[in-house]
């Protein structure tokens, strides 16, 4: 199975992440409110490449000179505009920060489809766009993502050697392990069994074993040999959607391969904690800025 099938599966599984997270509201501006900001430029753009429509929102200082760039991917329920406050905050700290999400040209009725990119080449379009931006120093680019966007960022780091720093909040790192129903008690095991049946139907296979090549392709933990940028993983210690063990194993694998990885655990936090708890969000964001400054501002 190739990278394209892995991205298709990754997008499909995000449906179940949404189900697992539940209906509790998220506040994307909780720590990052949009306020008038003199000296900050905003740009927005919608452009097509192949069968993908990219929605792009970016902020940067209104001054001359190249800036380190950060590409930001939202969680499964978010769009680029939801992350404008984060982009604005990064711009105030001296970054060119762009948030993106994707649509399919064959079905523009869906604002933010689960399957936005059907190949890793499509998933790299926004990164290449950032790379070519006249305000961005192409030698200092990082990626940042939340949940689905964190997984996307890790996979980008595996296929784009120019990425200098990766920050992934509560990412799914190993789909095969996450979908192993033997670790779950009733009734949670029923939900994961149903999930497996849906995946088999989507992939048009009759046995679970036939899904494993795609699960492995979509899992960042199976690409650690290709991730050379320093990685910061931020995870809630009480995350019941994507357990912190996912990030623990990924970090261990990266370190075992001689790569730089740091795992920062917020002890009592759950999934998407930074859009629900301001105090937890602040601690995580301070760590994020410290990491990006260390690796992108040289």
Predicted region positions:
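Alpha/beta-hydrolase active-site loop
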Residues: 113-134
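Short beta-strand/loop motif that positions the catalytic acidic residue
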Residues: 227, 233-235, 239
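Alpha/beta-hydrolase fold nucleophile elbow
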Residues: 136-146
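Hydrolase active-site cap/lid region
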Residues: 155-208
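N-terminal cap/lid segment of alpha/beta-hydrolase-fold proteins
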Residues: 27-63
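Conserved alpha/beta-hydrolase "acid-adjacent" motif
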Residues: 240-246
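Short substrate-entry loop that stabilizes the transition state in hydrolases
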Residues: 65-67, 72-107, 175-176
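C-terminal catalytic histidine-bearing segment of alpha/beta-hydrolase fold enzymes
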Residues: 248-249, 257-298
């Amino acid at each position: 199975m190739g990278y394209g099938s892995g991205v298709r599966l990754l997008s499909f599984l995000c449906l179940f992440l949404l189900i697992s997270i539940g209906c509790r509201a998220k506040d994307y501006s909780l720590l990052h409110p949009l306020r008038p900001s003199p000296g900050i430029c905003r740009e927005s753009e919608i452009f097509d490449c192949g069968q993908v429509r990219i929605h792009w929102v970016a902020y940067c200082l209104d001054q001359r000179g190249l800036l380190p760039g950060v590409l930001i991917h939202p969680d499964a329920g978010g769009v680029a505009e939801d992350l404008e406050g984060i982009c604005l905050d990064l711009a105030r700290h001296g970054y060119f920060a762009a948030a993106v999400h994707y649509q399919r040209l064959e079905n523009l009725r869906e604002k933010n489809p689960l399957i936005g990119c059907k190949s890793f080449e499509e998933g790299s379009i926004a990164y290449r766009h950032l790379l070519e931006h006249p305000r961005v120093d192409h030698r200092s680019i990082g990626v940042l993502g939340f949940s689905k966007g964190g997984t996307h960022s890790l996979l980008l780091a595996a296929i784009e050697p120019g990425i200098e720093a990766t920050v992934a909040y509560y990412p799914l790192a190993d789909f095969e392990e996450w979908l192993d129903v033997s670790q779950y008690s009733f009734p949670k095991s029923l939900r994961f069994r149903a999930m497996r049946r849906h995946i088999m139907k989507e992939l048009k296979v009759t046995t679970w074993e036939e899904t494993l090549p795609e699960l492995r392709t979509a899992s960042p933990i199976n690409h650690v040999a290709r991730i050379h940028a320093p990685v910061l993983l931020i995870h809630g210690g009480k995350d019941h959607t994507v357990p912190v063990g996912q990030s623990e194993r990924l970090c261990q694998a990266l370190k075992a391969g001689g790569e730089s990885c740091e795992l920062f655990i917020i002890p009592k936090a759950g999934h998407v904690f930074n859009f629900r708890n301001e105090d937890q969000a602040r601690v995580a964001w301070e760590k994020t800025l410290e990491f990006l400054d260390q690796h992108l501002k040289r």
